[in-house]
Swiss-Prot record:
The lineage of its organism: Bacteria, Pseudomonadati, Pseudomonadota, Gammaproteobacteria, Enterobacterales. The gene is pth. Hydrolyzes ribosome-free peptidyl-tRNAs (with 1 or more amino acids incorporated), which drop off the ribosome during protein synthesis, or as a result of ribosome stalling. Catalyzes the release of premature peptidyl moieties from peptidyl-tRNA molecules trapped in stalled 50S ribosomal subunits, and thus maintains levels of free tRNAs and 50S ribosomes. PROSITE patterns: PEPT_TRNA_HYDROL_1. GO terms for cellular component: cytoplasm. This is Peptidyl-tRNA hydrolase. The keyword RNA-binding applies. GO terms for biological process: protein quality control for misfolded or incompletely synthesized proteins; rescue of stalled ribosome. Its main location: cytoplasm. TRNA binds at residues 16, 67, 69, 115. It is an enzyme of class 3 (hydrolase).
């Protein structure tokens, strides 16, 4: 099994660029930068895309330009065009249930209330069997404050932790292609930014 599509979830536009909900896009942006493969807008895929080589494999990067709750439209368009199966997709997203400074790989599972994941599962024919990169952003402590929290900007101290976790996640994603998922997962799951 090889990953052929890496997606970073986000809301479009400058007003959302620095919000916690865009952590997935921060990850794909960093990966594109590390691999010297600038993202370019591609209307037919409803997002910014790039093509990279990881461990000798041809991989597409995607940051949808749809709103978060419509992310599945972009993912399904690209998966359909390139004949990519759900289990060949890695979706990076913000994760309330992990603290800033932590990121974890996961295969399949429910959407956990995340509107981006919810729409992707739906648009892939109710198939949740894709890989996720869960980027910890922490939780406001009150479920009624979640919307404002994910659409807010993290304080500098938290941003630093999130950035360090994303940096490690990018390294571990590259490692996945050269050394396998188990080794990459073990390394990433042992990491906690200080």
């Amino acid at each position: 099994m090889t990953i052929k599509l890496i997606v970073g979830l986000a809301n479009p536009g400058a007003e959302y660029a620095a919000t916690r909900h865009n952590a997935g896009a921060w990850f794909v942006d960093l990966l594109a930068e590390r691999l010297r493969a600038p993202l370019r807008e591609e209307a037919k895929f409803f997002g910014y895309t790039s093509r990279v080589t990881l461990g000798g494999e041809d991989v597409r990067l995607l940051v949808p330009t749809t709103f978060m709750n419509l992310s599945g439209k972009a993912v399904a368009a690209m998966a359909s065009f390139f004949r990519i199966n759900p289990d060949e997709i890695l979706v990076a997203h913000d994760e309330l249930d992990l603290p800033p400074g932590v990121a974890k790989f996961k295969l399949a599972g429910a959407h956990g209330g995340h509107n981006g994941l919810k729409d992707i599962i739906s648009k892939l024919g109710n198939n949740p069997n894709f890989h996720r990169l869960r980027i910890g952003i922490g939780h406001p402590g009150d479920k009624n404050k979640v919307v404002g929290f994910v659409l807010g900007k993290p304080p500098v101290s938290e941003q630093k932790l999130i950035d360090e976790a994303i940096d490690e996640a990018a390294r571990c994603t590259e490692m996945w292609f050269t050394d396998g998922l188990t080794k990459a997962t073990n390394r990433l799951h042992a990491f906690k930014a200080q």
